[in-house]
């Protein structure tokens, strides 16, 4: 039998630029995995940015820390066997940052870093340090760690755009 482990992240409640439907989409995907695929609820982890989960102390609050810790917890979870199916779904804001890189063959190369925006993006931590988005490079590193310890059956679904440019 196929074994699934699912991480669902849906963020509606951003300060200044809220979204609608991300939390309900994550809940609908949860329903699909439970009702249609038969995944036990204890194998589904939710991070939801809504009025019901508005406190950073809530373990379901989709802060940068909680989002980046959750995939790491998959890599170290002894119950997940090598080759099990892992699905990570994200619905929320995305971002895109341009940067310039010197290239020997070209004068200048324009590249982009794409990123996921946690609920606490555009805020600062307790030391006043700005909380960064989760870059594509960081996400790749996290997925590589999961792949190394749990196998290559990882599906990532990103329901976001990259309109917030910096």
What is each of the regions a protein language model found here?
Residues 14-27, 31, 132:
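Glycine- and acidic-residue-enriched helix-capping/strand-helix junction motifs
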Residues 3, 59-91, 95-166:
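Caspase-like (clan CD) cysteine peptidase catalytic core
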Residues 28-43:
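Signal peptide-proximal N-terminal region
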Residues 45-51:
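RNA-recognition motif
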Residues 14-20, 52-60, 128-129:
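Second-shell loop/turn segments in exported
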Residues 1-17:
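Short glycine-rich His-centered loop
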Residues 10, 29, 88:
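Terminal peptide-recognition signature
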């Amino acid at each position: 039998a196929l074994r699934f482990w699912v991480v669902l992240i849906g963020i509606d409640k951003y300060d200044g630029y809220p979204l609608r439907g991300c939390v309900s989409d994550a809940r609908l995907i949860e329903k699909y995995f439970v009702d249609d695929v038969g995944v036990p609820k204890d194998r589904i982890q939710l991070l939801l940015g809504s009025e019901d989960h508005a406190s950073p102390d809530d373990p379901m609050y989709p802060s940068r820390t909680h989002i980046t810790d959750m995939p790491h917890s998959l890599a170290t979870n002894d119950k997940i066997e090598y080759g099990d199916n892992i699905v990570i779904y994200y619905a929320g804001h995305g971002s895109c940052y341009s940067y310039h890189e010197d290239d020997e063959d070209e004068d200048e190369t324009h590249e982009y870093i794409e990123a996921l925006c946690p609920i606490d993006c555009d805020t600062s931590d307790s030391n006043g340090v700005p909380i960064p988005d989760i870059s594509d490079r960081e996400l790749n590193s996290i997925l590589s760690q999961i792949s190394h310890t749990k196998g290559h059956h990882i599906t990532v679904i990103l329901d976001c755009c990259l309109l917030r440019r910096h």
